[in-house]
Regions:
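Nucleotide-activated chemistry modules centered on ATP-dependent adenylation/adenylyltransferase
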Residues: 1-239
């Protein structure tokens, strides 16, 4: 990125730790502790909607930056994160709003006004679409055997997949589809352990990504147009 940087992550995920180690940068691992009362509420049937993890992590990193003397916080949120998941009653609803540009500017402005006027908060990937990101990531082969974007690997409670990719969730579907135009088939299948597009039972999941008869999943995935573009590009390649 043209400047000194530290790879920072929050929590105890060995997958994230392995990716951070592959960067070759100095690392900093932060931890947080959730109140056990939260899980008691869940068991009692409390409403449990989406947790804006990026907003929470951003606040933690602001505190860490002040304590440890950093002058900037760089996320990797792409342009597509600002797009609505759907429109409801005339209002845009975005599952990943705290990854979008509107939140980024709000927090940046608030931090400057109330915390530190010289602390930058931004995303390096903001100008790029998801496909522009995956096209570049496809060249970074050192991460292929350690990275995962499967949400089931990052559950706080409950079972996790035996492998890095469950192959069933919208995140697995989207990352597979977004990487497919830019990687040889044998490499892509090697990352995921199987060809997700060969499994007819997965078709409804891919249809949702394409926004075919359904809205985009409530997950941090790319725009429907990007998924359609990826599938079109893949269709032009020999089998």
């Amino acid at each position: 990125i043209g400047a000194e940087a530290t790879a920072v992550w929050i929590g105890n995920s060995p997958l994230i730790a392995a990716c951070a180690a592959r960067t070759g940068l100095p690392t900093l691992n932060l931890t947080r502790e959730l109140s056990p009362v939260l899980f008691e509420y869940n068991r009692a049937g409390a409403w449990n909607g989406h947790i804006p993890v990026t907003a929470i992590n951003s606040a933690i990193l602001v505190v860490a930056a002040v304590l440890y003397g950093y002058d900037g916080i760089a996320f990797s949120n792409e342009r597509s994160a600002s797009s609505a998941t759907l429109e409801y009653d005339g209002q845009a609803v975005n599952h990943q709003w705290s990854k979008g540009y509107a939140f980024e500017r709000l927090l940046h402005t608030w931090v400057h006004a109330h915390v530190a006027a010289d602390l930058a908060y931004f995303s390096l990937l903001r100008p790029f679409s998801e496909l522009a990101v995956t096209q570049r990531f496809a060249r970074l082969t050192r991460y292929f055997e350690v990275f995962s974007s499967c949400n089931r690997n990052f559950r706080l409670l409950g079972p996790r997949p035996a492998d890095r990719w469950c192959g069933q969730c919208p995140k697995c579907h989207f990352v597979f589809l977004a990487l497919a135009p830019f990687l040889p088939k044998i490499t892509l299948v090697g990352i995921f352990g199987r060809n997700l597009l060969d499994d007819e039972s997965q078709l409804p999941g891919f249809d949702a990504l394409l926004e075919y008869r359904e809205h985009k999943p409530f997950e941090c995935v790319g725009e429907g147009g990007e998924s359609r573009a990826a599938l079109h590009a893949l269709a032009q390649r020999p089998a």
